Regions:
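Positively charged n-region of N-terminal signal peptides that target proteins for export
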Residues: 1-5
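Sec-dependent N-terminal signal peptides
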Residues: 6-13
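C-terminal motif of bacterial Sec signal peptides marking the signal peptidase cleavage site
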Residues: 17-20
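Bacterial signal peptide processing site
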Residues: 22-24
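Short, aromatic-enriched amphipathic alpha-helices that serve as compact interaction elements
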Residues: 27-44, 51
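Hydrophobic beta-strand residues in large extracellular and virion-surface proteins
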Residues: 33, 86-91, 103-105, 165-167, ...
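Short solvent-exposed beta->alpha transition segments
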Residues: 49-128
């Protein structure tokens, strides 16, 4: 069971591995981005698929996996991920290709990266302490869940970035290009978790 909780941390990277498509007419690339981000805020992934050129099925599938382990952790995590605000700054059609566009978006998200790092450290500390104290696995698991919930709930909506979103017109419909290739947007939508994982990996490799 403890491995399942560690899975929550390590599998978050899969959250935004987005790879299929659905058709819905939109007038301009700015409107497409607005509709896509609004759908993510509402956790309406079926609607979001209409504005995205790849597959979003990994998002609800991942959420279901987390819910199977801990409904309370899944609810808190996905509520924070969805609770971002944004402002469209600029919409630009590629002067060399009218089927390509770029939308600049200012995003404000919960800093879940800090929560993620704290959760890893707090979980390992709690696990070791309770193990040496002779605690049962059930007790350690319960405490781990409490630790995760506390760290996520304490996160603040303080992460701000302006990112460029690229789109392409497919059969007269504007759609976002593959987000997994847009590191800055991916990191924002993850609440800075992606960059935090990268930084932690570098720290670990440096100490080897």
């Amino acid at each position: 069971m403890k491995k399942k909780y560690l899975l929550i941390f390590t599998c978050i990277l899969l959250l935004f591995c987005l790879t299929s498509c659905s058709k819905q007419e939109t007038e301009n690339p700015g409107e497409t981005v607005v509709n896509f981000l609004n759908a993510l805020q509402q956790q309406n992934y079926a609607s979001a698929k209409a504005y995205y050129s790849e597959n979003l099925d990994n998002l609800p599938n991942f959420k279901n996996k987390i819910e199977a382990i801990s409904p309370s952790v899944a609810n808190e995590l996905f509520s924070k991920l969805a609770d971002f605000s944004y402002t469209i700054k600029k919409v630009e059609i590629d002067s060399n290709d009218p089927n390509k566009a770029y939308v600049s978006v200012s995003l404000q998200c919960y800093d879940l990266g800090t929560a993620f790092k704290n959760t890893i450290l707090d979980y390992l500390k709690t696990d070791l302490e309770m193990t040496f104290d002779g605690a049962k696995d059930e007790e350690i698991i319960k405490k781990a869940e409490e630790t995760i919930l506390t760290d996520i709930s304490k996160s603040e909506k303080s992460f701000r970035r302006t990112v460029m979103i690229s789109l392409a017109k497919e059969e007269g419909t504007w759609k976002l290009n593959k987000i997994s290739e847009n590191h800055e947007l991916l990191n924002c939508l993850s609440g800075n978790i992606i960059n935090t994982i990268d930084e932690m990996s570098k720290e670990i490799n440096t100490t080897k």
